[in-house]
Amino acid sequence: MNQWMELAERVLDGGEVTEKEALSILECPDDDVLLLMHAAFQIRKRYYGKKVKLNMIMNAKSGLCPENCGYCSQSSISKAPIDSYRMVDKTTLLEGAKRAHDLNIGTYCIVASGRGPSNREVDQVVDAVKEIKETYGLKICACLGLLKPGQAERLKEAGVDRYNHNINTSKTNHSNITTSHTYDDRVNTVETAKKSGMSPCSGVIVGMKETKQDVVDMAKSLKALDADSIPVNFLHAIDGTPLEGVNELNPLYCLKVLALFRFINPTKEIRISGGREVNLRSLQPLGLYAANSIFVGDYLTTAGQNETEDHKMLHDLGFEVESVEEMKASLQR
């Protein structure tokens, strides 16, 4: 038995991954990556079988953000040519939900740019979510930024199932990425969402000049935060942002990152998120041996893979899509 299978068996028996072992996953020799992914798959299979959760993003508000996040094309310091608009209307949010439902996508993610939502914007989301729940029954994830007192409770009451607010990077690396809010601001928002009864979703962006130790710290921080869902983004550097031209990733390293997050967060939903197409490239399918969830369609300001291609990929792997009906049943358990 190889070292990765031994580690997987220990994790499945309730054991922890040490700091040294976590770093060794990221430093796995390229020739051994298939062995590593096979071991990660044993953990993934225990908790999720061969099911894949599908998620779709609605970019409900674009640009116009006062924050200075170095990776983001919507930030105040970005010169990227993007569409900027205020919160879309209810009809547009409902049309997006219908499209998700028709494509058998169980989770609909309403995402808005900005530091955090105004109470009026929360009103708009609340109004739309109530009708989406009644009409389509989708799982709703909201990603609206830092929350003010009372906003999380209103979203929960309206039917929002999950709230996303990514930590993005390690606490050590945070000030290299943004200075307009703190790492603790992000953690506190996830805790606020959790206290309201919404399922906490928080993830990372890998490839922002962080060290391997930073990546290990991210995975362990999300374990401590007890995030139910962990989106793992890989930097898609956009022209006009401070991280323009940064390209530190390769497909094999991205697979190692996904394996690390599965080993450290064995029971959690690990989602391959933004940047998978440009960073994993032809190795995208292998990522699902560690992860059990993907975004389908476009991201916020970058294009994703065609939905048909995603379904073909899952079929070719012998994996099964978690249907809308299965997702509804899971919400009732």
Curated annotation (Swiss-Prot):
Residues 47-276 form the Radical SAM core domain. Its EC number is 2.8.1.6. InterPro entries: Aldolase_TIM (IPR013785), BATS_dom (IPR010722), Biotin_synth/BioAB (IPR002684), Biotin_synthase (IPR024177), Elp3/MiaA/NifB-like_rSAM (IPR006638), rSAM (IPR007197). It catalyses: (4R,5S)-dethiobiotin + (sulfur carrier)-SH + 2 reduced [2Fe-2S]-[ferredoxin] + 2 S-adenosyl-L-methionine = (sulfur carrier)-H + biotin + 2 5'-deoxyadenosine + 2 L-methionine + 2 oxidized [2Fe-2S]-[ferredoxin]. [2Fe-2S] cluster binds at C109, C141, C201, R271. The keyword Zinc-finger does not apply. Keywords: 2Fe-2S, 4Fe-4S, Biotin biosynthesis, Iron, Iron-sulfur, Metal-binding, S-adenosyl-L-methionine, Transferase. Pathway: Cofactor biosynthesis; biotin biosynthesis; biotin from 7,8-diaminononanoate: step 2/2. It is an enzyme of class 2 (transferase). SMART domains: BATS, Elp3. It comes from the Bacteria. It holds the Pfam family Radical_SAM. Coiled coil: none annotated. The keyword Metal-binding applies. [4Fe-4S] cluster binds at C65, C69, C72. Binds 1 [4Fe-4S] cluster. The cluster is coordinated with 3 cysteines and an exchangeable S-adenosyl-L-methionine. GO terms for biological process: biotin biosynthetic process. Its cofactor is [4Fe-4S] cluster; [2Fe-2S] cluster. One of its GO terms (molecular function) is iron ion binding. PANTHER family: BIOTIN SYNTHASE, BIOTIN SYNTHASE, MITOCHONDRIAL. Belongs to the radical SAM superfamily. Biotin synthase family. Homodimer. Catalyzes the conversion of dethiobiotin (DTB) to biotin by the insertion of a sulfur atom into dethiobiotin via a radical-based mechanism. This is Biotin synthase. The gene is bioB.
